[in-house]
């Protein structure tokens, strides 16, 4: 349904930084800092399923992340929930394919590690039958050193006035160039120099670049 970088609530997701101490990881690490620094996101909906995502920032070896999906923003009616174990092998990302949802319905979702909680995201499943029309926002080519990232705020502002059904990213969500690469002439002045400063080659390079964009 929706993927975005920071502020969305309806078709995209919201972000916040929550930090605290919680027991996780190994027996030798009784309490470690945990935070949700990369927000939450949802996407790839069907009539009965949707994927929800987040990333945990921590020094632990692994983290058990609880997740909930509810029909109301107060989470008085939780319809699906579970626990997802994430670790360094997946860069502490959490990706859950939530199933057995109702068609054409809005849902709220969140993630928790102990008492620490992510921001609440909002998503929607597809309708059962065809629709006569749909409203969408389309974005593409998000080059960190030169991209017009304020467009995401503008989409949110427009959405609050006239809701979009979907936000569609056509591609080039990140660019792998290093410092001095394509369209990076003003990167230093804008405070948007690419992470690491070199072209992305390794898996770790790409993980850091995606984290920088988000």
Label each PLM-derived region with a short phrase.
Residues 27-29:
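Intrinsic-disorder/low-complexity linker and hinge segments
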Residues 1, 7-25:
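N-terminal export signals
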Residues 31-214:
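Divalent metal-dependent phosphoesterase catalytic cores across multiple superfamilies
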